[in-house]
Design a protein with these regions (language model features):
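Beta1-alpha1 glycine-rich phosphate/pyrophosphate-binding loop at the start
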Residues: 2-74, 158-203
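FAD-site-proximal beta/loop scaffold in flavoenzymes
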Residues: 2, 112, 121-148, 255-294
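Glycine-rich, N-terminal phosphate-binding loop of Rossmann-like dinucleotide-binding domains
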Residues: 94, 107-108, 156, 241, ...
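Short acidic, glycine/proline-rich loop/turn micro-motifs
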Residues: 44-48, 116-118, 273
Length: 294
């Protein structure tokens, strides 16, 4: 009897360990195939460093194929355009159809820049560190900014769910400017949709509020919480600050020469399109074992 075929969608910090551990547990009797949109692995936690030039792209990426082949794991570098859950197959951008017995979804999210007009690095006015490509664009914009320093706005957009990297980047950004003796020319404002500093989308972690407020003060970074960015224009961000009841507290018009704002996330299109698989934001509904309920 032939063994099962397990397909892992995504080759990031979730997908790669999943593939390795499945192979170690299942041995050679079952086949494992990893499918990823690009042929390289990117170590996402280092993106904030790349965005200010503290790391080179080559230091935080590596080719996926050779790493998986050493373990006897097949690899396909192609975007997935459709998941046929009923037919147990995925369709690739090049037209190929890959059948599976079990599917592991580890694609990561899609960045929903379209939810705030004028945001994002592709046709918008804010930078991102969500991918290595975005971090590279952020670095190029940062180098242009250094030629004519001015105000900077860093933070997270409405609907964002990953706030830690925004704080990390704010401190890295401030430190790099200090090293260049330019910090005094760059007033920094931290704008976040969190109800308070250090909430992190988790209701706080220990004394994260006190620690992060203290560090922001130490770095001379002002902040606006409960912030709803409504629009971004060239050199200007429009922000509505809300009170605890969700009512408008104050309207802000923030000038900037550089801005890095983490976007809200949604499920990637191929995953979100599967009927009954996801919630309205496109994230997979799971049980206590992280298995799909579908």
């Amino acid at each position: 009897m032939a063994g099962a075929h397990i397909v892992v969608l995504g080759a990031g910090i979730g997908g790669m360990p999943a593939a390795y551990e499945l192979k170690a547990a299942l041995g050679h009797e079952h086949r494992i195939t990893v499918i990823n949109a690009v042929d390289y692995f990117q170590f996402v936690p280092s993106n904030p460093w790349l965005a200010v030039g503290w790391r080179e792209r080559e230091a935080i990426t590596l080719p996926i194929g050779p790493a998986l082949e050493k373990k006897g794991i097949a690899f396909i570098a192609q975007p997935v355009v459709r998941i046929d859950a009923e037919g147990h197959a995925v369709q690739l951008e090049d037209g190929r159809r890959v059948a599976y017995d079990y599917l592991v979804i580890a694609t990561g999210p899609r960045q929903a820049f379209e939810e705030v007009p004028g945001s994002g690095p592709h046709g918008g006015h804010t930078q991102s560190i969500c991918t290595v490509d975005h971090a590279g664009l952020a670095l190029a914009e940062y180098r242009r900014f250094l030629e004519a320093p001015g105000p900077a706005v860093i933070g997270a957009m409405p609907g964002a769910s990953c706030f830690g990297p925004a704080y990390e980047f704010a401190f890295i950004f401030s430190r790099d400017l200090q090293k260049r003796k330019l910090r005094h020319k760059v007033p920094i404002t931290f704008v976040t949709s969190e109800p308070y500093i250090g909430h992190l989308g988790l209701g706080g972690v220990g004394d994260s509020r006190g620690m992060l407020e203290s560090e922001l003060r130490n770095h001379d970074i002002k902040w606006i919480c409960n912030a709803r960015v409504t629009r971004v224009e060239a050199g200007r961000m429009l922000v509505t600050e809300l009170d605890e009841a969700g009512q408008v507290k104050k309207e802000h018009e923030l000038p900037f020469g550089y801005s890095m704002m983490l976007p809200a996330f949604k499920g990637v299109d191929a995953v979100a399109a599967v009927e009954g698989l996801c919630n309205p934001r496109g994230f997979v509904l799971i049980d206590e074992h992280q298995r799909s309920r579908k």
